[in-house]
């Protein structure tokens, strides 16, 4: 009932954040984002994102505080734009150098910030639900928009939910599905395509998931049922509204990173859902406890065997699928599972990866989704987000604290399922 001043009353907030792990995460983020931002500038060349998106820059200018302040002073459009085009000394944030003093106009600074790619990253202990890492963006002083909480299109990181629902409803992991491009008359002749535009052959569930085959993800969704898949997603912890359309198989829904990791926490924790939390206690200046967290809610939402099957299938993503650069580029030939995700027009790149002790989610994209790479090779999750996970894991494994992670292993699925998983994934 007492009102406290967070800044003056000497309150002590004890959180679950692991200072060592957070340090490794920030180092990995900064290293990759400098490289990625440079690649983005090189990719754009002389073409600006607003050259084709005419109202992109205009909207950003009119939404700026500078424009609004001048408008409140009674200035008209032309005087406002003239004032905003005047160069003056200002401090801006650069991905390469941090705070930098420059001569720049207000409009130039708006252009600068429009092109900056932002990371979001969260790491959670699946058994306890303790949030160990939280990175909401490049620098909180300049970017208060928290990328971990921002709802964004999720792309293929949603596919494991589709396959998990299918297995729950009786799909066999050794059944083969035709990688054919087809139209769906009942859905306005919607014709999903694969990102590489390659078709043909037959894949098992494991093969289709590891190679992120869109055509088969849609088949699997419709075989299970859209409503049944949505119910399964909600049970695994996703609370966001999911449109009852077949494109959810390809991740058309907008879901925050903090929420999208919840199914993966469930797979890593043997089918038990645990609510992530970050605040342990609040004490006053005399050490009296004002708040103490309750143990997080734990609930079995899928059988342990089903979770083990999903971890086995998601391990194949790393060993032979879209996440294999974790082995090739980062030397992480250890038990890991995960999934890449790339959204429409490469607006966002995702990667969610885990071992039995930690689940890590990463998303990278500009604040405005109309600012993006125009190349799938550069804008895919394996290039945008996965490297942060790879660098982070390297740092952890080189430390005394987390070196033991390299010796961890996932629980094996039941014998019959192991046999199903062992069949060739493509024919």
Predicted feature descriptions by range:
Residues 171-229, 273, 285-311, 315:
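Conserved catalytic neighborhood of penicillin-recognizing serine enzymes
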Residues 4-12, 38-45, 223-224, 231-235, ...:
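Short coil/turn segments at secondary-structure boundaries
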Residues 190-194, 225-262, 271, 275-278:
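Mid-domain, small-residue-enriched loop/turn segments at the edges of structured enzyme/sensor domains
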Residues 114, 119-131, 158, 164, ...:
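C-terminal substrate/ligand-recognition segments
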Residues 15, 19-35, 65-125, 130, ...:
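A penicillin-recognizing enzyme superfamily signal
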Residues 2-8, 140-142, 186-189, 210-212, ...:
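Short acidic (Asp/Glu) and glycine-rich catalytic loops that position anionic groups and cofactors
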Residues 146-187, 320, 394:
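Active-site rim segments in enzyme catalytic domains, especially the processed small/beta chain
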Residues 1-75, 220, 234-235, 239-241, ...:
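Non-catalytic, structured segments within soluble enzyme domains
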């Amino acid at each position: 009932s007492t009102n406290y001043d967070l800044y003056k009353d000497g309150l002590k907030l004890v959180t679950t954040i692991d200072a060592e792990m957070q340090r490794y995460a920030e180092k990995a983020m900064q290293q990759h984002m400098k490289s990625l931002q440079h690649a983005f500038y090189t990719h754009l060349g002389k073409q600006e994102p607003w050259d084709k998106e005419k109202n992109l820059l205009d909207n950003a200018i009119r939404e700026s505080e500078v424009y609004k302040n001048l408008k409140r002073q009674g200035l008209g459009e032309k005087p406002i734009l003239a004032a905003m085009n005047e160069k003056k000394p200002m401090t801006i944030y650069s991905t390469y150098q941090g705070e930098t003093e420059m001569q720049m106009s207000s409009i130039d600074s708006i252009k600068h910030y429009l092109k900056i790619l932002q990371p979001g990253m969260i790491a959670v202990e699946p058994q306890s639900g303790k949030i160990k890492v939280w990175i909401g963006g490049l620098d909180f002083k300049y970017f208060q928009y928290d990328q971990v909480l921002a709802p964004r299109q999720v792309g293929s990181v949603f596919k494991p939910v589709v396959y998990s629902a299918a297995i729950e409803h009786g799909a066999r992991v050794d059944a083969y599905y035709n990688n054919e491009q087809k139209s769906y008359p009942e859905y306005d002749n919607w014709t999903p395509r694969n990102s590489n535009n390659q078709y043909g052959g037959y894949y098992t569930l494991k093969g289709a998931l590891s190679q992120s085959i869109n055509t088969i993800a849609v088949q699997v969704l419709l075989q299970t049922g859209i409503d049944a898949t949505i119910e399964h997603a909600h049970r695994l912890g996703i609370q966001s509204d999911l449109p009852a359309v077949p494109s959810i198989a390809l991740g058309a829904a907008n879901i925050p990173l903090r929420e999208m990791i919840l199914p993966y926490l469930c797979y890593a924790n043997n089918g038990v859902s645990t609510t992530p939390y970050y605040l342990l206690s609040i004490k006053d200046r005399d050490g009296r406890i004002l708040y103490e967290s309750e143990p997080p809610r734990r609930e079995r939402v899928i059988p342990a065997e089903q979770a083990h099957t999903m971890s086995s299938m998601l391990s194949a993503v790393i060993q032979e699928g879209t996440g294999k650069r974790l082995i090739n580029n980062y030397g992480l030939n250890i038990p890991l599972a995960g999934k890449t995700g790339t959204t429409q027009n490469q607006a966002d790149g995702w990667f969610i990866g885990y071992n039995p002790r930690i689940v890590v989610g990463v998303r990278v994209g500009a604040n405005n989704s109309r600012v993006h790479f125009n190349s799938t090779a550069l804008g895919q999750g394996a290039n945008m987000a996965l490297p942060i996970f790879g660098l982070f894991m390297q740092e952890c494994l080189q430390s005394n604290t987390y070196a033991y992670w390299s010796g961890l292993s996932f629980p094996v699925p039941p014998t019959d399922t192991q046999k199903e998983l062992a069949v060739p994934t493509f024919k």
